From Swiss-Prot:
Transmembrane segments: none annotated. It comes from Homo sapiens. Residues 1-143 are annotated as: Repeat-rich region. Residues 1-49, 71-143 are annotated as: Disordered. Gene3D superfamilies: Annexin (1.10.220.10). Keywords: Acetylation, Annexin, Calcium, Calcium/phospholipid-binding, Repeat. This is Annexin A7. The lineage of its organism: Eukaryota, Metazoa, Chordata, Craniata, Vertebrata. Disulfide bonds: none annotated. Interacts with PDCD6. Residues 89-102 have a biased composition (Gly residues). GO terms for molecular function: calcium ion binding; calcium-dependent phospholipid binding; calcium-dependent protein binding; integrin binding; phosphatidylserine binding; RNA binding. GO terms for biological process: autophagy; epithelial cell differentiation; membrane fusion; negative regulation of gene expression; response to calcium ion. Residues 1-18 have a biased composition (Pro residues).
């Protein structure tokens, strides 16, 4: 799946963007002006997310829609966070004794893990006996006991079959953005509206919001071109002169072509002192092959730099190797599932981690970097059936730091990509202060892809709407534009 508006082949140079080899993080004056409004390129604006342990599983919704009202996860415990949707059967995301979970996350009732490495699977397939038929605490078994008949409108991520044959089974994923191309679009008329909104004393921010939030990215590029053709002026330069702060950052992000925005975000994350590793993970571990290849080409053409070389110089160890694997854009994207391969991969992952002293990191890297997301979901289910522990918990026990975060991001996207972004948005706004750069980046980049599903998962996971949380954490025109984008 590629972003709407992406070119089918290659990535042509963007008019007005900096020529190859220009080291400035923004194009020069007179071209595509980004200089002063954005946060410093080396800024460490991204908060640290706890490094290990996910909350107890809440069950993955089956095809047909949202869980019935009784199937929603209960309100979080004080200081806790809700369950992560889409987890295969088994132990859930709680970390066994000796492992560290997310701070404040409620842990499911413990089951016997024993000390040290997990027990070697018995011939029956489960260390220590039979796999429990239900989640701890009586939650429904994945996936058949979740009643979704009354919520048929919800586009779900179809659970994989429990039939472990060698025949492939097709899995489809349906997503939908909140922003769609406007009907009866007229770029010249929109350009005139924006010019009038910025003409004279003061700025009509509401007029700007009405146009920008209701046009697709491709239509915004046409408005930008029409503005220059009609008035001989650069629209972005005029907007920058009228706006400031978070509103300026949001407007500029909306007018960047999607691939350029991802490439720009990666450059910003690695430029200057320090590295914003969470940004590298969020982009490189969640994009499709086509998107990644276009990002790599755009990064080279617009900034005159090699993305892989920059990753190698800014990261190290197993985290570096994981990101280098990701920026190749060579993941298998076949949507069918080979259950025999899933069982074999599950066994290999067990033997590379829980079933031995130490960890064979290269085995985890190879499987998680090359298998399709539907195939990884089947592998996670096979792993839970075999090891009596979910693969996310095992990754938390075997890895730490950013490589752990990267591997878990891949697995979370395989389970339920909208839930991953919902969680990122939640932590961008939770607590004191707001990580506005993460909020802007996710809302903008997912607005034409799967923001509808992200909103649905946000409400299911946190018992409040995304719009409600945005309204409470932002203000003014910035809030109005964000709410207009998310459809609130």
């Amino acid at each position: 799946m590629s972003y709407p508006g992406y070119p089918p082949t290659g990535y042509p140079p963007f008019p007005g963007y900096p020529p190859a080899g220009q080291e400035s993080s923004f194009p020069p004056s007179g071209q595509y002006p980004y200089p002063s409004g954005f946060p410093p390129m080396g800024g460490g604006a991204y908060p640290q997310v706890p490094s290990s342990g996910y909350p107890g599983a809440g069950g993955y919704p089956a095809p047909g829609g949202y869980p019935a009202p009784g199937g929603y996860p209960g309100a979080p415990q004080p200081g806790g966070a809700p369950s992560y949707p889409g987890v295969p059967p088994g132990q859930g995301f709680g970390v066994p004794p000796g492992g560290a979970g997310f701070s404040g996350y409620p842990q499911p009732p413990s089951q016997s893990y024993g000390g040290g490495p997990a027990q070697v699977p018995l011939p029956g397939g489960f260390p220590g006996g039979q796999m429990p038929s239900q989640y701890p605490g009586g939650q429904p078994t994945y996936p058949s006991q979740i009643n979704t008949d009354s919520f048929s409108s919800y586009p779900v991520f179809s659970p994989v079959s429990l039939d472990y044959s060698s025949e492939p089974a097709t899995v489809t994923q349906v997503t939908q953005g909140t922003i769609r191309p406007a009907a009866n679009f007229d770029a010249i008329r929109d350009a005139e509206i924006l010019r009038k909104a910025m003409k004279g004393f003061g700025t009509d921010e509401q007029a700007i919001v009405d146009v920008v939030a209701n046009r697709s990215n491709d239509q915004r590029q046409k408005i930008k071109a029409a503005f220059k053709t009609s008035y001989g002026k650069d629209l972005i330069k005029d907007l920058k002169s009228e706006l400031s702060g978070n509103m300026e950052e949001l407007i500029l992000a909306l007018f960047m072509p999607p691939t350029y925005y991802d490439a720009w975000s990666l450059r910003k994350a690695m430029q200057g002192a320090g590295t914003q590793e969470r940004v590298l993970i969020e982009i490189l571990c969640t994009r499709t092959n086509q998107e990644i290849r276009e990002i790599v080409r755009c990064y080279q053409s617009e900034f005159g730099r090699d993305l892989e070389k920059d990753i190698r110089s800014d990261t190290s160890g197993h985290f570096e190797r994981l990101l280098v694997s990701m920026c190749q854009g060579n993941r298998d994207e076949n949507q069918s599932i080979n259950h025999q391969m899933a069982q074999e991969d599950a066994q290999r992952l067990y033997q590379a981690g829980e079933g031995r002293l130490g960890t064979d990191e290269s085995c985890f890297n190879m499987i998680l970097a090359t298998r399709s997301f539907p195939q990884l979901r089947a592998t996670m289910e096979a792993y839970s059936r075999m090891a009596n522990r979910d693969l996310l918990s095992s990754v938390s026990r075997e890895f730490s730091g950013y490589v752990e975060s990267g591997l878990k991001t891949i697995l979370q996207c395989a389970l339920n990509r909208p839930a991953f972004f919902a969680e990122r948005l939640y932590y961008a706004m939770k607590g004191a202060g707001t990580d506005d750069s993460t909020l802007v980046r996710i809302v903008v980049t997912r607005s034409e892809i799967d923001l509808v599903q992200i909103k649905q998962m946000f409400a299911q996971m946190y018992q409040k709407t995304l719009g409600t949380m945005i309204a409470g954490d932002t203000s003014g025109d910035y809030r109005r534009l964000l709410l207009a984008i998310v459809g609130q």
